[in-house]
Protein backbone atom coordinates (compact mmCIF):
# COMPACT_ATOMS: atom_id res chain seq x y z
CA UNK A 1 0.00 0.00 0.00
CA UNK A 2 2.82 2.40 0.86
CA UNK A 3 4.52 1.57 -2.42
CA UNK A 4 1.47 2.81 -4.32
CA UNK A 5 1.48 6.11 -2.42
CA UNK A 6 5.11 6.69 -3.37
CA UNK A 7 4.80 5.42 -6.95
CA UNK A 8 6.10 7.83 -9.62
CA UNK A 9 4.69 6.00 -12.62
CA UNK A 10 1.98 7.85 -14.51
CA UNK A 11 -0.04 4.66 -14.63
CA UNK A 12 1.32 2.51 -11.86
CA UNK A 13 0.10 -1.08 -11.76
CA UNK A 14 -2.13 -1.60 -8.70
CA UNK A 15 -0.29 -4.80 -7.80
CA UNK A 16 3.15 -3.13 -7.72
CA UNK A 17 4.81 -6.09 -9.45
CA UNK A 18 8.59 -5.68 -10.01
CA UNK A 19 8.51 -7.56 -13.32
CA UNK A 20 6.01 -5.02 -14.70
CA UNK A 21 7.68 -1.86 -13.35
CA UNK A 22 10.73 -0.25 -15.03
CA UNK A 23 11.71 1.36 -11.71
CA UNK A 24 11.69 -1.93 -9.78
CA UNK A 25 12.94 -4.30 -12.48
CA UNK A 26 16.74 -4.28 -12.18
CA UNK A 27 16.57 -2.07 -9.08
CA UNK A 28 19.75 -3.43 -7.51
CA UNK A 29 21.73 -2.76 -10.68
CA UNK A 30 21.10 0.99 -10.28
CA UNK A 31 20.62 1.62 -6.57
CA UNK A 32 24.30 2.23 -5.76
CA UNK A 33 24.49 5.20 -8.14
CA UNK A 34 21.29 6.66 -6.68
CA UNK A 35 22.51 6.31 -3.10
CA UNK A 36 25.92 7.79 -3.96
CA UNK A 37 24.34 10.84 -5.59
CA UNK A 38 22.05 11.46 -2.64
CA UNK A 39 24.69 10.96 0.05
CA UNK A 40 27.14 13.27 -1.72
CA UNK A 41 24.61 16.10 -1.66
CA UNK A 42 22.23 17.54 0.94
CA UNK A 43 22.04 16.11 4.43
CA UNK A 44 18.26 15.73 4.49
CA UNK A 45 15.95 13.80 2.19
CA UNK A 46 12.25 14.48 1.85
CA UNK A 47 9.68 12.92 -0.45
CA UNK A 48 10.50 15.33 -3.30
CA UNK A 49 14.21 14.49 -3.10
CA UNK A 50 13.47 10.76 -3.21
CA UNK A 51 11.11 11.16 -6.16
CA UNK A 52 13.66 13.25 -8.06
CA UNK A 53 16.47 10.75 -7.51
CA UNK A 54 14.15 7.86 -8.35
CA UNK A 55 13.29 9.38 -11.71
CA UNK A 56 16.90 10.30 -12.45
CA UNK A 57 18.26 6.82 -11.77
CA UNK A 58 15.13 4.80 -12.64
CA UNK A 59 14.69 3.19 -9.24
CA UNK A 60 11.66 2.63 -7.03
CA UNK A 61 11.33 5.64 -4.67
CA UNK A 62 9.82 3.52 -1.89
CA UNK A 63 12.70 1.02 -1.86
CA UNK A 64 15.18 3.88 -2.30
CA UNK A 65 13.86 5.51 0.86
CA UNK A 66 14.21 2.27 2.80
CA UNK A 67 17.79 1.70 1.62
CA UNK A 68 18.72 5.33 2.22
CA UNK A 69 17.39 5.22 5.79
CA UNK A 70 20.20 2.84 6.76
CA UNK A 71 22.69 5.64 6.06
CA UNK A 72 20.85 8.30 8.06
CA UNK A 73 21.43 9.42 11.64
CA UNK A 74 17.82 10.54 12.09
CA UNK A 75 14.69 9.07 10.50
CA UNK A 76 11.42 11.03 10.83
CA UNK A 77 8.24 9.12 10.15
CA UNK A 78 4.72 8.26 11.21
CA UNK A 79 4.04 6.14 14.30
CA UNK A 80 3.34 3.09 12.17
CA UNK A 81 6.97 2.73 11.03
CA UNK A 82 7.83 1.72 14.60
CA UNK A 83 4.60 0.40 16.12
CA UNK A 84 2.53 -1.08 13.30
CA UNK A 85 3.03 -4.88 13.18
CA UNK A 86 2.63 -4.92 9.39
CA UNK A 87 4.52 -1.87 8.08
CA UNK A 88 7.16 -1.26 10.75
CA UNK A 89 10.72 -0.95 9.43
CA UNK A 90 11.77 -4.57 9.68
CA UNK A 91 15.39 -3.83 8.80
CA UNK A 92 15.62 -1.82 12.02
CA UNK A 93 13.08 -3.15 14.46
CA UNK A 94 12.83 -6.91 13.94
CA UNK A 95 15.70 -7.06 16.44
CA UNK A 96 16.93 -4.70 19.14
CA UNK A 97 19.33 -1.90 18.28
CA UNK A 98 21.00 1.19 19.69
CA UNK A 99 18.06 3.41 18.76
CA UNK A 100 16.64 6.45 20.53
CA UNK A 101 12.92 7.00 19.92
CA UNK A 102 11.40 10.49 20.19
CA UNK A 103 7.61 10.17 20.07
CA UNK A 104 5.84 13.50 19.56
CA UNK A 105 2.12 14.07 20.26
CA UNK A 106 2.23 10.90 22.34
CA UNK A 107 -1.29 11.50 23.67
CA UNK A 108 -2.49 10.24 20.26
CA UNK A 109 -0.52 7.00 20.48
CA UNK A 110 -2.98 4.88 22.54
CA UNK A 111 -5.82 5.27 20.02
CA UNK A 112 -3.46 4.90 17.06
CA UNK A 113 -1.97 1.75 18.58
CA UNK A 114 -5.39 0.23 19.22
CA UNK A 115 -6.25 0.78 15.57
CA UNK A 116 -2.92 -0.69 14.38
CA UNK A 117 -3.44 -3.95 16.28
CA UNK A 118 -7.16 -4.24 15.52
CA UNK A 119 -8.66 -5.45 12.23
CA UNK A 120 -11.99 -5.32 10.41
CA UNK A 121 -13.51 -7.57 7.76
CA UNK A 122 -16.84 -7.33 5.91
CA UNK A 123 -18.76 -10.25 4.45
CA UNK A 124 -19.71 -8.20 1.38
CA UNK A 125 -16.09 -8.20 0.18
CA UNK A 126 -16.35 -11.97 -0.36
CA UNK A 127 -19.62 -11.70 -2.27
CA UNK A 128 -18.24 -8.91 -4.47
CA UNK A 129 -15.06 -10.89 -5.16
CA UNK A 130 -17.05 -13.91 -6.34
CA UNK A 131 -19.07 -11.66 -8.62
CA UNK A 132 -15.91 -10.03 -10.00
CA UNK A 133 -14.44 -13.43 -10.90
CA UNK A 134 -17.36 -14.13 -13.23
CA UNK A 135 -18.60 -17.54 -14.27
CA UNK A 136 -16.66 -20.76 -13.98
CA UNK A 137 -15.23 -22.90 -11.22
CA UNK A 138 -11.89 -22.46 -9.49
CA UNK A 139 -10.14 -23.21 -6.22
CA UNK A 140 -10.44 -19.55 -5.31
CA UNK A 141 -14.20 -19.47 -5.91
CA UNK A 142 -14.64 -22.59 -3.78
CA UNK A 143 -12.69 -21.03 -0.91
CA UNK A 144 -14.59 -17.74 -1.22
CA UNK A 145 -17.92 -19.58 -1.18
CA UNK A 146 -17.03 -21.50 1.99
CA UNK A 147 -15.90 -18.34 3.77
CA UNK A 148 -18.97 -16.44 2.57
CA UNK A 149 -21.25 -19.20 3.84
CA UNK A 150 -19.54 -19.20 7.25
CA UNK A 151 -20.04 -15.45 7.61
CA UNK A 152 -23.65 -15.80 6.44
CA UNK A 153 -24.33 -18.33 9.20
CA UNK A 154 -22.56 -16.07 11.70
CA UNK A 155 -24.82 -13.21 10.63
CA UNK A 156 -27.87 -15.38 11.29
CA UNK A 157 -26.50 -16.39 14.69
CA UNK A 158 -25.70 -12.78 15.50
CA UNK A 159 -29.23 -11.66 14.67
CA UNK A 160 -30.75 -14.47 16.71
CA UNK A 161 -28.56 -13.70 19.74
CA UNK A 162 -29.19 -9.96 19.52
CA UNK A 163 -32.40 -9.14 17.60
CA UNK A 164 -32.72 -5.54 16.53
CA UNK A 165 -35.71 -3.71 17.94
CA UNK A 166 -38.07 -2.51 15.22
CA UNK A 167 -38.09 1.03 16.67
CA UNK A 168 -34.39 1.32 15.80
CA UNK A 169 -34.74 -0.04 12.28
CA UNK A 170 -34.72 2.20 9.24
CA UNK A 171 -35.20 1.67 5.53
CA UNK A 172 -31.50 1.08 4.94
CA UNK A 173 -31.40 -1.66 7.59
CA UNK A 174 -34.49 -3.91 7.32
CA UNK A 175 -35.97 -5.44 10.45
CA UNK A 176 -33.98 -8.39 11.73
CA UNK A 177 -36.14 -9.69 14.53
CA UNK A 178 -35.57 -13.19 13.15
CA UNK A 179 -33.96 -14.62 10.05
CA UNK A 180 -34.59 -18.19 11.18
CA UNK A 181 -37.72 -20.20 11.91
CA UNK A 182 -38.67 -20.17 15.58
CA UNK A 183 -36.67 -22.64 17.73
CA UNK A 184 -34.27 -23.30 14.85
CA UNK A 185 -30.59 -23.04 15.77
CA UNK A 186 -28.20 -21.49 13.22
CA UNK A 187 -25.74 -23.83 11.52
CA UNK A 188 -22.85 -21.97 13.16
CA UNK A 189 -22.70 -21.62 16.92
CA UNK A 190 -20.92 -18.59 18.33
CA UNK A 191 -19.03 -18.62 21.65
CA UNK A 192 -20.86 -17.33 24.72
CA UNK A 193 -21.20 -13.56 24.22
CA UNK A 194 -20.04 -10.90 26.64
CA UNK A 195 -22.80 -8.64 25.34
CA UNK A 196 -25.54 -9.00 22.75
CA UNK A 197 -28.00 -6.33 21.72
CA UNK A 198 -29.38 -4.73 18.55
CA UNK A 199 -27.61 -7.07 16.12
CA UNK A 200 -24.22 -6.53 17.77
CA UNK A 201 -22.44 -9.29 19.67
CA UNK A 202 -19.21 -9.02 21.67
CA UNK A 203 -17.18 -12.18 22.29
CA UNK A 204 -14.17 -12.79 24.50
CA UNK A 205 -12.99 -15.74 22.44
CA UNK A 206 -12.04 -15.31 18.77
CA UNK A 207 -14.55 -16.94 16.37
CA UNK A 208 -12.43 -19.79 14.99
CA UNK A 209 -15.34 -20.97 12.82
CA UNK A 210 -15.00 -17.72 10.85
CA UNK A 211 -11.25 -17.32 10.93
CA UNK A 212 -10.46 -20.81 9.62
CA UNK A 213 -12.30 -20.39 6.27
CA UNK A 214 -10.80 -16.90 5.90
CA UNK A 215 -7.32 -18.36 6.35
CA UNK A 216 -8.17 -20.95 3.69
CA UNK A 217 -8.85 -18.13 1.21
CA UNK A 218 -5.29 -16.78 1.39
CA UNK A 219 -3.38 -19.39 -0.64
CA UNK A 220 -5.74 -19.64 -3.66
CA UNK A 221 -6.19 -15.86 -3.61
CA UNK A 222 -2.44 -15.29 -3.73
CA UNK A 223 -2.10 -17.85 -6.53
CA UNK A 224 -4.82 -16.08 -8.53
CA UNK A 225 -3.22 -12.65 -8.06
CA UNK A 226 0.15 -13.94 -9.26
CA UNK A 227 -1.36 -15.74 -12.25
CA UNK A 228 -3.63 -12.85 -13.34
CA UNK A 229 -1.70 -9.57 -12.93
CA UNK A 230 -3.58 -7.84 -15.76
CA UNK A 231 -7.09 -9.04 -14.92
CA UNK A 232 -9.77 -6.39 -14.54
CA UNK A 233 -10.61 -7.71 -11.07
CA UNK A 234 -6.98 -7.67 -9.89
CA UNK A 235 -7.16 -4.42 -7.89
CA UNK A 236 -10.38 -5.48 -6.17
CA UNK A 237 -9.04 -8.91 -5.23
CA UNK A 238 -5.78 -7.38 -4.07
CA UNK A 239 -7.75 -5.27 -1.58
CA UNK A 240 -9.52 -8.44 -0.44
CA UNK A 241 -6.13 -10.11 0.01
CA UNK A 242 -4.97 -7.26 2.26
CA UNK A 243 -8.22 -7.39 4.26
CA UNK A 244 -7.94 -11.16 4.80
CA UNK A 245 -4.29 -10.76 5.72
CA UNK A 246 -5.10 -8.04 8.25
CA UNK A 247 -7.81 -10.04 10.02
CA UNK A 248 -5.79 -13.28 10.15
CA UNK A 249 -2.71 -11.48 11.47
CA UNK A 250 -4.81 -9.85 14.17
CA UNK A 251 -6.10 -13.32 15.07
CA UNK A 252 -2.52 -14.49 15.58
CA UNK A 253 -1.98 -11.69 18.13
CA UNK A 254 -5.35 -12.27 19.80
CA UNK A 255 -5.17 -12.69 23.57
CA UNK A 256 -6.84 -11.32 26.69
CA UNK A 257 -6.23 -7.77 25.45
CA UNK A 258 -8.73 -8.27 22.60
CA UNK A 259 -12.46 -8.73 22.12
CA UNK A 260 -14.43 -9.68 19.02
CA UNK A 261 -17.30 -7.58 17.73
CA UNK A 262 -19.83 -8.96 15.25
CA UNK A 263 -22.40 -6.56 13.81
CA UNK A 264 -25.21 -7.54 11.42
CA UNK A 265 -26.62 -4.81 9.20
CA UNK A 266 -29.12 -6.00 6.63
CA UNK A 267 -27.21 -8.49 4.47
CA UNK A 268 -23.86 -7.35 5.83
CA UNK A 269 -21.80 -8.87 8.64
CA UNK A 270 -18.89 -6.90 10.02
CA UNK A 271 -16.24 -8.83 11.93
CA UNK A 272 -13.85 -6.82 14.09
CA UNK A 273 -11.00 -8.03 16.28
CA UNK A 274 -10.57 -5.10 18.63
CA UNK A 275 -7.42 -4.44 20.62
CA UNK A 276 -8.63 -2.79 23.84
CA UNK A 277 -5.26 -2.57 25.54
CA UNK A 278 -2.22 -1.99 23.29
CA UNK A 279 0.19 -1.58 26.23
CA UNK A 280 2.16 -4.85 25.80
CA UNK A 281 2.56 -4.29 22.05
CA UNK A 282 3.70 -0.67 22.42
CA UNK A 283 6.10 -1.71 25.17
CA UNK A 284 7.59 -4.43 22.95
CA UNK A 285 8.12 -1.92 20.13
CA UNK A 286 9.84 0.58 22.42
CA UNK A 287 12.01 -2.24 23.77
CA UNK A 288 13.57 -2.54 20.29
CA UNK A 289 15.60 0.59 21.08
CA UNK A 290 17.92 1.71 23.84
CA UNK A 291 15.63 4.44 25.18
CA UNK A 292 12.54 6.45 24.36
CA UNK A 293 11.09 9.85 25.19
CA UNK A 294 7.35 10.32 24.70
CA UNK A 295 6.15 13.90 24.90
CA UNK A 296 3.11 16.07 24.31
CA UNK A 297 1.54 19.27 25.58
CA UNK A 298 -1.41 17.20 26.84
CA UNK A 299 0.22 14.04 28.22
CA UNK A 300 -1.66 14.06 31.51
CA UNK A 301 -2.27 12.41 33.84
CA UNK A 302 1.04 10.55 33.50
CA UNK A 303 -0.20 7.52 35.45
CA UNK A 304 -2.85 6.89 32.79
CA UNK A 305 -0.40 7.07 29.90
CA UNK A 306 2.11 4.87 31.72
CA UNK A 307 -0.63 2.25 31.97
CA UNK A 308 -2.01 2.38 28.41
CA UNK A 309 1.45 2.57 26.80
CA UNK A 310 3.08 -0.14 28.88
CA UNK A 311 5.67 2.24 30.33
CA UNK A 312 5.13 1.37 33.99
CA UNK A 313 8.72 2.23 34.96
CA UNK A 314 8.96 5.44 32.93
CA UNK A 315 9.87 8.69 34.62
CA UNK A 316 7.47 11.59 34.10
CA UNK A 317 8.60 15.20 33.84
CA UNK A 318 6.17 18.13 33.66
CA UNK A 319 7.46 21.49 32.49
CA UNK A 320 5.87 24.92 32.52
CA UNK A 321 4.65 26.26 29.21
CA UNK A 322 7.36 28.20 27.36
CA UNK A 323 4.76 30.75 26.23
CA UNK A 324 4.02 33.79 28.45
CA UNK A 325 0.54 33.86 29.98
CA UNK A 326 0.05 37.26 28.36
CA UNK A 327 0.02 35.51 24.98
CA UNK A 328 -3.24 33.76 25.82
CA UNK A 329 -6.54 35.42 25.01
CA UNK A 330 -10.09 34.17 25.19
CA UNK A 331 -12.79 35.88 23.16
CA UNK A 332 -16.48 35.03 23.53
CA UNK A 333 -18.74 36.35 20.76
CA UNK A 334 -21.96 38.12 21.55
CA UNK A 335 -24.84 36.51 19.67
CA UNK A 336 -28.04 38.53 19.41
Q: What function would you assign to each model-found segment?
A:
Residues 72, 79-80, 105-107, 113:
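Conserved Walker B
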Residues 107, 112-194:
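Conserved phosphoryl-transfer catalytic core
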Residues 53-70, 85-92, 223-330:
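A contiguous, basic/glycine-rich beta-loop/short-helix subdomain that forms a polymer-engagement track
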Residues 77-78, 102-103, 292-295:
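Structural recognition of the conserved hydrophobic beta-strand(s) that form the central parallel beta-sheet
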Residues 3-4, 8-11, 325, 329-335:
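Residue-level detector of conserved catalytic or cofactor/ligand-binding positions
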Residues 1-75, 83, 131, 152-155, ...:
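A substrate-engagement module of RecA-like helicase motors
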Residues 82, 108, 300:
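Residues immediately C-terminal
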Residues 137, 151, 155-158, 214, ...:
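A structural signal for well-ordered alpha-helices, especially hydrophobic packing surfaces
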Amino acid sequence: RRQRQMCIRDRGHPACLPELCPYANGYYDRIKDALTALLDGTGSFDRAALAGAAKRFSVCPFELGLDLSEWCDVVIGDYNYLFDPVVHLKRFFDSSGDWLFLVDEAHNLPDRARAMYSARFCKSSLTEAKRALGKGKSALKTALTKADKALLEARKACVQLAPRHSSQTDAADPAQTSLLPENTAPALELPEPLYAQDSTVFLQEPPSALLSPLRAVQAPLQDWLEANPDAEAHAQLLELYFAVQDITRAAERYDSHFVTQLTARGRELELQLLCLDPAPFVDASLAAGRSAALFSATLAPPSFYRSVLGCSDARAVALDSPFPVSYTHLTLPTIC
